Amino acid sequence: MPRIAYLGPQGTFTESALLQMISGAMVPGGDADDTAVTPVPTDSTPAGLEAVRSGAADYACVPIENSIEGSVLPTLDSLAVGAPLQIFAELTLAVSFSIVVRPDHDGDVATVAAFPVAAAQVRRWLAEHLPAAQLVPAHSNAAAAADVAGGRADAGISTALAAERYGLRSLAAGVVDEPNARTRFVLVGRPAPPPARTGADRTSVALRLPNTPGALVAAMTELSIRDIDLTRIESRPTRTELGTYVFFLDCVGHLEDDAVAEALKALHRRCEDVRYLGSWPTGTAAGAPPPSSDEATRWLTRLREGLPTPPEGGR
């Protein structure tokens, strides 16, 4: 029975994403029955990943990217250091919030408990509807609901699931400044063979480059010359000295795609370190898949065997 860490307490968007991963049979070694999985709530995203490293959990469901705020930096930073971890699945969740209060609350709202990422996504709504309220930081969206239930805040920015579990009522539901807000969650475990190639896959790596002119351009060239679609590049400081960075790259394709495999081998030669973060299915095409090398391989084989080749390299 897989143990899966997630940002708790119960009622967070991360728990909602985890439940959808379970029902979609996306957890290795599990099935679509949520009783076949043991959820392990943690206080933070890094704590969930450390639970996997220590063996206290088999996987962690963590947010990695938000359409409003961009990459979830604690997740990236935790993946870049420590024992290697690997991504096995992803799920994108539509995000909207509930402004929750205790059932007997009928006065003004002076304090609002909020997870900072959530507060950023409802900033305009708060300015319009609760301009005088003071924000009180919470560990998570569900923790904001717990703060309201415990009387530590008048209202909270939380989820419908948390409101139900803590017996709260909603002042407003479906609250979000941007109606198409989405958060992408990933399922992370210890290194293992990646899920099978589907043709709609994503591969991610973290690179440490030598401090030489053109090092980043040279690394990117290994992808471009193979027609690999790069969908994300982001840098984070190594925290060891000024001017040194880890570069996170996402591309369309799978480790089993010849073009991706060749690019990774080339990056391994060029970079000080290449941390493979996984190849996994995205469910839908996220860009142009890498070209097949089958035709070129057949052409090269004929050359090596001294056989005639069709005009124009076999095309």
Swiss-Prot record:
It catalyses: prephenate + H(+) = 3-phenylpyruvate + CO2 + H2O. This is Prephenate dehydratase. Pathway: Amino-acid biosynthesis; L-phenylalanine biosynthesis; phenylpyruvate from prephenate: step 1/1. One of its GO terms (biological process) is L-phenylalanine biosynthetic process. It comes from Mycobacterium sp. (strain JLS). It comes from the Bacteria. Its EC number is 4.2.1.51. It is an enzyme of class 4 (lyase). Residues 3-190 form the Prephenate dehydratase domain. The record marks T183 as: Essential for activity. Signal peptide: none annotated. GO terms for molecular function: prephenate dehydratase activity; protein homodimerization activity. One of its GO terms (cellular component) is cytoplasm.
